[in-house]
C-alpha cells in the first residue's frame, strides 16, 4: 500500500540528451533531503532557512563527491503544485547525469514516485479537482492547437465551474425538500413543485448542451478520422501528399499504385486530421490490391469524414456509384478533381447521381473543383472541413467542450435523474421521490470533479500519467 505522507522524487523532464534535466522532490522531507546533497556557493546557506519560491545556485554532492553544477528552486508548503514542500533541481541534461542525481535523492530518503503521483497529491490535497487533474494529462498528450486549448480551458476550470454551479442549484432544492419534510409546520411545500420542475428543466438544457459538445470535443482532442476514397488514379495520393506537405504516397499515372493503407496525422488550421489514403475502389483480381480495397471500406465505416475524390477527366462508373451509396450516413466532401484537364464529369452530372444514390442528404454534400496536380481548390477544401464540423468557428470563450468520455457518461446519468424528477412531478409522486432523484443527479455530477468517486477510479486515472508529473 502506497503512503501519500512520505517524500517522493522523479525526473520531470524527457529522458533524452537535452540541455537541462529537472528532478522534482515533494513531501515533508523534500527540503531536508535537498540540504543533505546541495551545497550553495555560500557554503553556510541551508535551504530550510531560505524563503519560499527562491532560486539558488550551487552543486550536488554525493558523500562529498561532486556530481553536477545546479540551480535549485525551493517552494514551501502549501504554495506548491502538490501543496507540499517541493524542490526542483535543474541540472545538466543527459540520461546518465539526471539518473545519478535522482539515485542520490532516493539514497537520502525519498521514494521513487509513481506515474502521475505529483498531480495525484495535488488532487488528494485539495489543490485541484479531478477534472482539472485529467486536463493536465490532456495537455501533455495534445496533438494539435485546439486540443491544447481545450485542455488548458478545462485546467482553468471551464468544466469544474459549470458542474459546481449546477450542483449548487440541485443542493438548494434538496435542502428545501428535506427541511420541509422535517418541519412541515413552519416550511410550506405549496407551489414548490413548479419551481423544482423549472430548475430541472433548466439544468437538463444545460447538461444537454454539454453532452452535445462532446462530439466536437472528441474531435478537438483526438482529431477527425478522415478517409480518402475514390477509384484508382483519381488523385487520392496526390491529395494526401499536399495535406502532409511531402511525398508520402507514390504518385504515378498507373492505376492501382496505392494497394494498402497510408496513415498520417495532419494539423489543419489547428484541427487534427487522422488521414487515411486508401487503395482505389474497383473490382480487381489482384489479391494484394483486393485486400487493400476491403481495408479501405472497413476504415471508411469508422470514419468521421469521407473525402470522395472524383476523376472528372473520365466518365463515372460503378466504383463511383458504390462510394456514393456508402456516403448516405457519413459526413462527406467531394473533390471534383483534375480541373486542369478537359473534364467529362460536370458538377451538375455529379449532383444528379448523388441525388439518386444518396437521397435528400445529397444537398448537404459540398462539391469542390480541384486539381491536386496544380494545387487548385485545396484552400477552399480545407476551410470547408472547419465549416462542416465547427460552423467555421472554434471558440473557447463562450463554449465548453466535453472531451472526456467519463465526463459525458456522468452528465448523461445526471440528465436521466433530472428527467425522472420532472416525470415524478408530472405523476404527482411523493416528495421523497424528488429528493432521491435530485441526490442521484448531484452525485453523478460530483464524479466529474472527484467528489463521488472510489479509489480504484482515481488510481486508474492517474496511472495514465507519465513519471514526474
Would you name each region that the model predicts?
Residues 275, 309, 335:
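Generic enzyme active-site microenvironment
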Residues 56-67, 72-76, 256-284, 302-305:
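Switch I (G2) and immediately adjacent beta-strands of P-loop GTPase domains
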Residues 1-149, 153, 157, 333:
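A glycine-rich (often HGG/GG-containing) alpha/beta subdomain
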Residues 2-11, 15-18, 145-267, 284, ...:
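C-terminal-of-GTPase-core extension/linker across diverse P-loop GTPases
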Residues 111, 272-274, 366:
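Conserved beta-strand segments of alpha/beta enzyme cores
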Residues 93, 243, 278, 310-313, ...:
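Glycine-rich, N-terminal phosphate-binding loop of Rossmann-like dinucleotide-binding domains
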Residues 289-313:
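Inter-motif core of Ras-like GTPase G domains
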Residues 60, 197, 306-317:
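Glycine-rich phosphate-binding loop used to anchor ATP phosphates in small-molecule kinases
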Amino acid at each position: 500500500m502506497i503512503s501519500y505522507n512520505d517524500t517522493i522524487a522523479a525526473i520531470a523532464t524527457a529522458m533524452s540528451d537535452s540541455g537541462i534535466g529537472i528532478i522534482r522532490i515533494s513531501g515533508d522531507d523534500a527540503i531536508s533531503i535537498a540540504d543533505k546533497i546541495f551545497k550553495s556557493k555560500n557554503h553556510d546557506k541551508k535551504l530550510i532557512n531560505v524563503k519560499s519560491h527562491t532560486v539558488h545556485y550551487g552543486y550536488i554532492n554525493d558523500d562529498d563527491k561532486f556530481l553536477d553544477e545546479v540551480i535549485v528552486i525551493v517552494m514551501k508548503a502549501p504554495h506548491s503544485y502538490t501543496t507540499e514542500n517541493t524542490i526542483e533541481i535543474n541540472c545538466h541534461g543527459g540520461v546518465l547525469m539526471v539518473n545519478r542525481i535522482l539515485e542520490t535523492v532516493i539514497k537520502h530518503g525519498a521514494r521513487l514516485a509513481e506515474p502521475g503521483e505529483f498531480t495525484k497529491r495535488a488532487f488528494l490535497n485539495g489543490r485541484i479537482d479531478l477534472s482539472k487533474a485529467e486536463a493536465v494529462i490532456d495537455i501533455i498528450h495534445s496533438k494539435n492547437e485546439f486540443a491544447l486549448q481545450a485542455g488548458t480551458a478545462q485546467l482553468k476550470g471551464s468544466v469544474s465551474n459549470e458542474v459546481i454551479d449546477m450542483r449548487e442549484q440541485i443542493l438548494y432544492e434538496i435542502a428545501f425538500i428535506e427541511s420541509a419534510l422535517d418541519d412541515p409546520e413552519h416550511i410550506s411545500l405549496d407551489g414548490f413543485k413548479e419551481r423544482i420542475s423549472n430548475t430541472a428543466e433548466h439544468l437538463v438544457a444545460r447538461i444537454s448542451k454539454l453532452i452535445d459538445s462532446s462530439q466536437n470535443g472528441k474531435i478537438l482532442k483526438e482529431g477527425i478520422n478522415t478517409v480518402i476514397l475514390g477509384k484508382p488514379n483519381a488523385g487520392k495520393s496526390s491529395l494526401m501528399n499536399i495535406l502532409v506537405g511531402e511525398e508520402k504516397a507514390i504518385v504515378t499515372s498507373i492505376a492501382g499504385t496505392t494497394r494498402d493503407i497510408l496513415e498520417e496525422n495532419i494539423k489543419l488550421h489547428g484541427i487534427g486530421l487522422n488521414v487515411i489514403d486508401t487503395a482505389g475502389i474497383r473490382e480487381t483480381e489482384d489479391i494484394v490490391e483486393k485486400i487493400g480495397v476491403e481495408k479501405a471500406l472497413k476504415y471508411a465505416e469508422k470514419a468521421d469524414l469521407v473525402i470522395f475524390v472524383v476523376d472528372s477527366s473520365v466518365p463515372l462508373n460503378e466504383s463511383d456509384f458504390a462510394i456514393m451509396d456508402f456516403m448516405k450516413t457519413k459526413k462527406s466532401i467531394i473533390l471534383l478533381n483534375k480541373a486542369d484537364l478537359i473534364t467529362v464529369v460536370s458538377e451538375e452530372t455529379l449532383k444528379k447521381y448523388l441525388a439518386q444514390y444518396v437521397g435528400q442528404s445529397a444537398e448537404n454534400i459540398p462539391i469542390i473543383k480541384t486539381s491536386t496536380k496544380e494545387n487548385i481548390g485545396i484552400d477552399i477544401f480545407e476551410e470547408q472541413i472547419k465549416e462542416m464540423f465547427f460552423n467555421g468557428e472554434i471558440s473557447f470563450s463562450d463554449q465548453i467542450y466535453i472531451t472526456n468520455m467519463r465526463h459525458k457518461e456522468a452528465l448523461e446519468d445526471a440528465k436521466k435523474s433530472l428527467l425522472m424528477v420532472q416525470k415524478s412531478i408530472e405523476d404527482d409522486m411523493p416528495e421523497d421521490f424528488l429528493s432521491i432523484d435530485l441526490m442521484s443527479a448531484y452525485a453523478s455530477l460530483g464524479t466529474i470533479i472527484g467528489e463521488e468517486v472510489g479509489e480504484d477510479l482515481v488510481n486508474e486515472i492517474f496511472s495514465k500519467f507519465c513519471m514526474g508529473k
